[in-house]
């Protein structure tokens, strides 16, 4: 019998339904794997007792012929989602040992369908980062390594723990979040599938906020089908989130096998950036060839304001963060450092509670919102954002979906880029546009680099057309036949 931790989410659900194994058995297998894999540092909180309790409850429901769409499936939860009674810190010192008294809407949706929680997953502090090096718990380690090199590699960020856990078979799938590429970049780095849905599809209630107009929940999973299955359940209208869309959630799982015959796929010329590696260019061309062979029509499109996307993002996101993170003052919850007066207590709590990258972004955000610079920076960035949205509106008059690389590089070693914030920020160059425009985007593993590391392709769809992402993603997955797994060194 296959090792239970090797199963895809879809295969595990089939096995649970047909009683080939119990939820207690598969949950126990994952808990054992987690115990043996702590060197990966994927989990920051393990919940074995809660997991087994949930698994036994699932088994009882399955025995009665009852159960939800995720009944008995063990999942990992990014430490950004509030989980009632389980510590949630967004991997920041300032939240101390904060334990929520309520459940986020996304995780509640999962539990309502019978999912089992294995624990909370590592991430960049407050989701600010592209390498997961800003976590208070230290970075998770990518299960993949370069050929002939033992250097520890980043699993990407900010959802690095989610990507490392799925890639290392430490959960069937995981929740993640994406503000500028934090689902799609880690998925590309770890040979997993990650999708960011349309802004407003999934509720942000109970998600620790970074940049409210950009943050969006989504899954990281082993296959395109698994990601569709999980996203269907994560998404719902929620009156507790004012940005939540009142729209039906389609049957995305059925879209995965519909093919791309008759679809028009746009190739943006502006994504051929200076210095793009030959490997990634070749993979992009291979993706184009696969879609053509599957019956899609390829059209060149233009997204003229692409070059302004990163600068606009790194003004808008820190500005929103400086507003959102003002609530952390050591008074009502989280860590407090006493000062001689109230102001000093605020200053000391924030100075010791926020890490360097978070402090950097808060300073940028406060600066661009200050009265003398608001018009020069923030207002202009919002105008650029509107232009980027209009670029996509025009492009989608010519095509049904857009194909690009997911990342400008493969996974890099820890410390390789952390000394240069600008080089680190460039990791988001292909992903931020979808966040600024509120569009869905999926990263699908499509090949290996010469050094043996995964490479992903990204598909961007029209607003509320995740179906196109899943259709194209399914074809890319079939054509690439990506079955490579990291050699177990841990």
Swiss-Prot record:
Q: Which reaction does it catalyse?
A: L-glutamyl-tRNA(Gln) + L-glutamine + ATP + H2O = L-glutaminyl-tRNA(Gln) + L-glutamate + ADP + phosphate + H(+)
Q: Which GO terms describe its biological process?
A: translation
* Gene Ontology terms for molecular function: ATP binding; glutaminyl-tRNA synthase (glutamine-hydrolyzing) activity
What EC number(s) does its UniProt record assign? 6.3.5.7
Checking Gene3D superfamilies in the record gives:
Amidase signature (AS) domain (3.90.1300.10)
Enumerate the active-site residues: 78 (charge relay system), 158 (charge relay system), 182 (acyl-ester intermediate)
Q: Does the keyword Nuclease apply?
A: no
The cross-references to InterPro entries, in alphabetical order and at most eight, read: Amidase, Amidase_CS, Amidase_dom, AS_sf, GatA
Q: Which domain of life is it from?
A: Bacteria
Provide the alphabetized UniProt keywords: ATP-binding, Ligase, Nucleotide-binding, Protein biosynthesis
Question: Of which family is this protein a member?
Answer: Belongs to the amidase family. GatA subfamily.
Described function: Allows the formation of correctly charged Gln-tRNA(Gln) through the transamidation of misacylated Glu-tRNA(Gln) in organisms which lack glutaminyl-tRNA synthetase. The reaction takes place in the presence of glutamine and ATP through an activated gamma-phospho-Glu-tRNA(Gln).
Annotated protein name in UniProt:
Glutamyl-tRNA(Gln) amidotransferase subunit A
Species assigned in the record: Hyphomonas neptunium (strain ATCC 15444)
The primary gene name is: gatA
